[in-house]
Amino acid sequence: MRPQMRWKLCWENELELSDHTELAEFFRKTYGPTGTFNARPFEGGHSWAGARPELRVIGYDAHGVAAHMGLLRRFIRVGDADLLVAELGLWGVRPDLEGLGLNHSIRVMYPVLQQLGVPFAFGAVRHALYKLVGRLCRNGLGTIVAGVRVRSTLSDVYLNLPPTRTEDVLVVVFPIGRPMSEWPSGTLIERNGPEL
């Protein structure tokens, strides 16, 4: 039986301290099984890991936060083209609900993306999530773009690390205001900031 989900769309300034602490706990539990390092950014009540989202879709059920997706509008560079996008990140579904939350969260977010007037939304996820993201793209909402790496700045300055990192990730693009045929070609996306 599917749990009853209640979806909340909120701007970052609308979140209370209690929202941040509840989300931080959700992210630690959701990202922790993929490695301790992945849960570390959410210590101390942080409900973001790199760049802070401007808008969030949060799914709740009887047990609290069940799913989450964050959005940040930004300019990225794909090949030689500068492009306004809505970056989608901080995707998460509580482990006991996997398979139920991501599709619903993008469906809640999609009308908002249209209202924001962005040409595309994009997200980058681990290759291990190919099946999950593939299900999302099956209905034509998005396209997995293969062979693209993403370069980002680190969220903090570390004297022992370079200021940027380039990752081989799975890139998914959602055409919003323009058709997918207008997504620029290129093998590198420059985020020009930290990942969401």
From Swiss-Prot:
Its main location: cytoplasm. It is found in: Cytoplasm. Belongs to the NodA family. It comes from the Bacteria. InterPro entries: NodA, Nodulation_prot_NodA_CS. N-acyltransferase required for nodulation. Acts in the production of a small, heat-stable compound (Nod) that stimulates mitosis in various plant protoplasts. Keywords: Acyltransferase, Cytoplasm, Nodulation, Plasmid, Transferase. The keyword Membrane does not apply. This is Nodulation protein A. Its EC number is 2.3.1.-. The lineage of its organism: Bacteria, Pseudomonadati, Pseudomonadota, Alphaproteobacteria, Hyphomicrobiales. Coiled coil: none annotated. One of its GO terms (cellular component) is cytosol. The keyword Cytoplasm applies. It comes from Sinorhizobium fredii (strain NBRC 101917 / NGR234). One of its GO terms (molecular function) is acyltransferase activity.
